[in-house]
Amino acid sequence: MMCWFDWKCAYSNTPLTKERRTIDHIIPLNNMGINEPWNCVPCFDSYNYQKNTNDMEEWYSQQPYFSEERLNKIYAWIEYAYEKWGKEE
């Protein structure tokens, strides 16, 4: 996952530091999200805190660092990760 996003925040495209990086659940766990690769992206801990239980796309589109290109990369990650690890054999 970190390589997919070039060791950068999935939302801001800023290089992540070890001290401030975390994993955001695209669909929050308390909103019926699951702890699987296709539901997770790397981001800054402060962005994860700000997003909280909000819808990812709704929250992200309101941020000053919003990028349609990054949003598409997030959706491409979801599709790739689900194809690789999510399908039952």
Give short role names for the model-derived ranges:
Residues 1-6, 33-36:
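Short, flexible, mixed-charge glycine/proline-rich loop motifs
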Residues 11-42, 48-58:
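Histidine-centered nuclease catalytic patch
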Residues 38-39, 46-89:
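A detector for short metal-coordination/catalytic motifs
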